[in-house]
Amino acid sequence: MAAAIPASIDEVTAQWMSDATGWNVTAVRNEIIGVGVGVSSAVYRSHLTGSGCPTSVIVKLPALDPNAVFTSAVLRMYIREVKFFKTLAKDVPFRVSQSYYGEVNEETSQFAMVVEDLGSLRIVDQVKGMAIDDARRAVDGVAAMHAKWWGKADALAADGTTISLGDPIYPAVVPMVFAEGWEKCTKEIKMPDSIMQVGPRFGAAVAPLLSSLAQGPNTLAHGDYRADNILFGNDDELVVLYFQLIGTGIGAYDLAYFITQSISADDARRYEREQFDRWIQGLLSRGAPKDLVDKKALW
């Protein structure tokens, strides 16, 4: 029987870690990682002493902010991540953290995960933007994932492993979250006129925009594919993190989100078409049915 889900980091003790992982852990020292690093989750590094165990692991628990927990629970974010590691992680075509423990109460959304500590890998500063060679590797990786489930991902939403990007829960929640963030940003930052023309009207446009993201052929979408959730290992091996927004929808969403969020504006203008063409070629070379890859519609 799996170890009980801890109510807080204070319950992540040596005994709990031993029960959860099967290791012989004699001491645990927990430290929160950063401030504002985990928005939907509280993220900790647990330093371990014992035998047959790594020196450190990452522990994820619900966020410390009750509002963030509420939003995450409504969107089934904790449920999605636990289900991903239990059912899909072994099949994705890139490296992910090894999961040592993952449980969620689907009624309360209380959850806990213990995963591999990948803190030694190379990170990318999303503010500066990802170098184009790294971006190409990231596009190749997401294309391979999309190809594997191209035209076949509706079943994942049907069984609750993912949520469709067109699910009614998104337009019920996202405009509220956006409005809160928009108010804070406009109070603190002077927005360009071009942004001010769009921002006040964006919330009302969310529903039709999201609906369009599920008008197939659908695939497995990461949902938050950007530099902050990507690492690079030895020989520039692609490593992808964070699967709380895993969804079913059109793969072009992941690509557009990545290009607009993870490379500089200059590189986006210069390489946008190249990256799109690379993604299309990746889909086809990895087995996505040619008759289901409409390049014109996806662009």
Each model region followed by its residue ranges:
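Glycine- and acidic
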Residues: N67-T71, I123-K128, L241, F258-A265
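Conserved NTP-binding catalytic cores of kinases and kinase-like/nucleotidyltransferase enzymes
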Residues: M1-Q110, G233-L238
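Active-site activation/catalytic loop segments of kinase-like enzymes and analogous catalytic loops
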Residues: K83, T87, L245, G251-A288
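Active-site acidic catalytic loop and adjacent metal/ATP-binding pocket
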Residues: V37-L48, G52-C53, V57-I58, A205-G251
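Helix-rich C-terminal or lid/interface subdomains of diverse kinases
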Residues: R136, Q281-W299
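Conserved short submotifs of the Hanks-type protein kinase catalytic core
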Residues: T108-L121
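A generic secondary-structure signal for well-formed alpha-helical elements
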Residues: V92, R122, H146-A153, W279, ...
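ATP-dependent phospho-/nucleotidyl transfer catalytic cores
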Residues: A2, L121-H222, N234
